Amino acid sequence: MGYYSLTEVTAVQYAKEHGYFEKKANVVCHEIGDGNLNYVFKLDDGEKSIIIKQALPYAKVVGESWPLSIKRATIESKALQIFAKYVPEYVPVVYSHDEELAVTIIEDLSKLTITRKGLIDGEEYPLLSQHIGRFLANVLFYTSDFGLQSEEKRVLEGTFVNPDLCKITEDLVFTDPFGHYDTNDYESELQLAVDELWSDKTLKLKVAQYKYKFLTRKEALIHGDLHTGSIFSSPSETKVIDPEFATYGPFGFDIGQFIANLLLNALSREEEQRSVLFFHIEKTWSYFVDTFTKLWIGEGVEAYTKEKQWLPIILQNIFTDVVGFAGCELIRRTIGLAHVADLDEIANKETRIQAKKQALSLGRELIKYESKNADIQLFRALFQQTVSGGVKA
C-alpha cells in the first residue's frame, strides 16, 4: 500500500489491525503532538493506552517545502532500543516499528509531564539531574570505543547515518543563527544585539570549530536533540524521548544542549527561583563524571583505558565541548527557527526582551570561553556575570 499519513480514525484502525485493541473496542484517539516533525496519537480504550508516532515526509513547522526522509523514524526506534539496552529505566518501551509507514508504537507516558512545561510551571524534579547524568554516561560510554569493541562500534555507527536531521542541526544550531539567513526569527528589539553577534569574528571562528567537531567527531551515539522538551518527568521518574536526531557525534553535544535548556529556564525566572536550575546543571555533570568514571574503570574495552592519566584528559575535553555546544544552543533557541516557551512565554515584553538579550550574551560568553581546567561552576559564574552585569541595549 505504501506510505500514507495517519488520521485519528486510521490510527485506531491501524492499532486494531495490529492487535493492540479488540476489533469492537471503543478506542478514543487524539492527536497530541506539539513538535515540529511528526504526528503523535494517543489511543485509549479505558483499560490500556498506547502512543502511535508517525514521521511526516516534511517538516511540519515549515510545510511540504521542506522535505525530510521518513527513515528518521527507524533511526528513532533503533536509538530507543539501544538506550534501553543500557538504561531501560530512562526510556519508554518500544512495542513495534513499521518502517514502511514510519510508525512507532510506544509506551504511553502521559502520567508524566514534559519537563520544559513542568519547569515553566515551577515544578521540581529532584532526580532529574541524577537520571540524565546517568543516562548520558551509560549511553555515551557503551556506544563509544571505550565501552564497545571497535568493529562493533563501526557497524553500529553505520546504522545511525542520519543526513536529513544532521543537516538541520548543522544549519539551525551552527550556521543560520550566526548570519543573515531566512530561518532566523527574532523581535526587532533584538536587532542591535543580533548585529553585534553577527559582526563578532572571534565568535564565528569558535562556532566554526564547534560545527566542525559536530561534523567530524563520531565519538558515541548521541540523542542529538536533548532539550527539556524531549524529556518526560515526575518527582520520581525521568524518561528520554524523541531521539530522531540520533547519530554518532561528540560526547559533549547532548550534555551541552541539556544544560543550555536549563539555563534558558533560569533566565525566565526571578533570581530567588534559579538555584534549583544550577543544582541540576552541576549535578548532571557530577553524576555523568562519576558514572562514566566507574564504567571506564570497570567496563573499559579499549587498551588505553588502563592509563590512569587519560581519563582526566577525556573528561576535560568533553567539558570544553559541553561549554561551547551549550552556548550555540542558547543562541539558536533565542533567534533561530525553533524557539523555546521558557523565553517566548514571558508575559511582560520588556522582561522577555531583556531575558533574550541575556541569553545571547551568555551564549557568546560560553562559546568564546577558553575553558581549559574550568569546572562545572563556570555556568553559574558566567550566568551571574552576564545577568548581574546587564547587557548592551
From Swiss-Prot:
HAMAP family: Salvage_MtnK. It catalyses: 5-(methylsulfanyl)-D-ribose + ATP = 5-(methylsulfanyl)-alpha-D-ribose 1-phosphate + ADP + H(+). Catalyzes the phosphorylation of methylthioribose into methylthioribose-1-phosphate. ATP binds at residues 38, 53, 107-109, 242-244. It comes from Bacillus cereus (strain AH187). SUPFAM superfamilies: Protein kinase-like (PK-like). The gene is mtnK. GO terms for molecular function: ATP binding; S-methyl-5-thioribose kinase activity. Belongs to the methylthioribose kinase family. This is Methylthioribose kinase. Homodimer. InterPro entries: Aminoglycoside_PTrfase, Kinase-like_dom_sf, Methylthioribose_kinase. Keywords: Amino-acid biosynthesis, ATP-binding, Kinase, Methionine biosynthesis, Nucleotide-binding, Transferase. Pfam families: APH. NCBIfam families: MTRK (TIGR01767).
